[in-house]
Amino acid sequence: MLRATTSAVPRALSWPAAPGNGSEREPLDDRDPLLARVELALLSTVFVAVALSNGLVLGALVRRGRRGRWAPMHVFIGHLCLADLAVALFQVLPQLAWDATYRFRGPDALCRAVKYLQMVGMYASSYMILAMTLDRHRAICRPMLAYRHGGGARWNRPVLVAWAFSLLLSLPQLFIFAQRDVGDGSGVLDCWASFAEPWGLRAYVTWIALMVFVAPALGIAACQVLIFREIHTSLVPGPAERAGGHRGGRRAGSPREGARVSAAMAKTARMTLVIVAVYVLCWAPFFLVQLWSVWDPKAPREGPPFVLLMLLASLNSCTNPWIYASFSSSISSELRSLLCCPRRRTPPSLRPQEESCATASSFSARDTSS
């Protein structure tokens, strides 16, 4: 049986207690009171940070959408905010209530629903970043293909695929978790998971680490390498370009247009690099601790550093909105308006062209119209 303790967030990634042996089970409540208060304070801070950050950015996007059609970049950012808000509402908030009461207070159906939605938020947040990066790669490396698909709708294929995979990959939670007795005949119930085989826990936690963290990180990093290579190739003219102003059969645009496209591509590369670095830094501690806890029987599972690191599954959801807002002048200006910080309007001709670099459709539209 997979033991659900206050030291695992989400509790889908906890470690097992010895099944069928009440003497090996922990007491009904053996928490360190000080550590429990620190957990509650940390979870409360994370919840406020995730909800406020993503709520502000989503509000800025809604304000901008009322004045016209969303740019393709805004579609991805909007859905990433929704995914991160799902993390706050369905992962952090239930975990906060759970830690406050120590045991899960609710019927079996609610237990299964909470466990399912906790994983949906984790998957959706990771896969939306991957979908956005894949779209940026297509914009820069395959602009004609991107142009044929178009963009700007509130839903597009990468967004739908990201949500669909998140909903499907979270389904095992409904069958693994249930309200179960925490001891032999004690009558106390908690939302625990059980596996038919002793190796089931290790396999499941490793699978989640691969699908939520490792696979998306490798996909994002691979796109980053290809984007950097394309930018380097476009900025370093070959012999044919120097002789006739063409490369790869494409007609060269004006020097001003070429400089703007190059700057937009470079900005995309910088943003993607920041995303990869922050993504790894935020997720790595959590999953390293989770894997350590299930693969090493002697892991210090109850130590304060171990416990607190397991609370940081939602850290990436705090940083996502600010990364994209800092690289998007349009979102930044809307945020200033929301926060009552007026700024002198910049002429359209002088505004940064971040939307053209960040998504496939808008980048390719400019590229093909030159």
From Swiss-Prot:
Cytoplasmic side: 63-76, 135-158, 220-270, 328-370
Transmembrane residue ranges: 38-62, 77-97, 113-134, 159-179, 200-219, 271-292, 308-327
Record topology, Extracellular segments: 1-37, 98-112, 180-199, 293-307
GO BP terms in the entry: cellular response to hormone stimulus; G protein-coupled receptor signaling pathway; positive regulation of gene expression; positive regulation of vasoconstriction; regulation of systemic arterial blood pressure by vasopressin
Positions with biased composition (Polar residues): 356-370
Compartment annotation: Cell membrane
Keyword Cell membrane: yes
Gene3D superfamilies: Rhodopsin 7-helix transmembrane proteins (1.20.1070.10)
Pfam families, per the entry: 7tm_1
Region described as Disordered: 1-28, 347-370
Glycosylation-annotated residues: 21
Residues where lipid is bound covalently (S-palmitoyl cysteine): 340-341
CDD domains assigned: 7tmA_V2R
Cellular component aspect of the GO annotation: plasma membrane
Coiled coil feature spans: none
Gene Ontology MF term list: vasopressin receptor activity
Membrane disposition: Multi-pass membrane protein
Key words, A-Z: Cell membrane, G-protein coupled receptor, Glycoprotein, Lipoprotein, Membrane, Palmitate, Receptor, Transducer, Transmembrane, Transmembrane helix
Alphabetized PANTHER family for the sequence: NEUROPEPTIDE RECEPTOR-RELATED G-PROTEIN COUPLED RECEPTOR (PTHR24241), VASOPRESSIN V2 RECEPTOR (PTHR24241:SF20)
Summary of the function given for this chain in its UniProt record: Receptor for arginine vasopressin. The activity of this receptor is mediated by G proteins which activate adenylate cyclase. Involved in renal water reabsorption.
Record-stated family: Belongs to the G-protein coupled receptor 1 family. Vasopressin/oxytocin receptor subfamily.
Subunit description: Interacts with ARRDC4. Identified in a complex containing at least ARRDC4, V2R and HGS. Interacts with TMEM147.
Name of the protein in its database record: Vasopressin V2 receptor
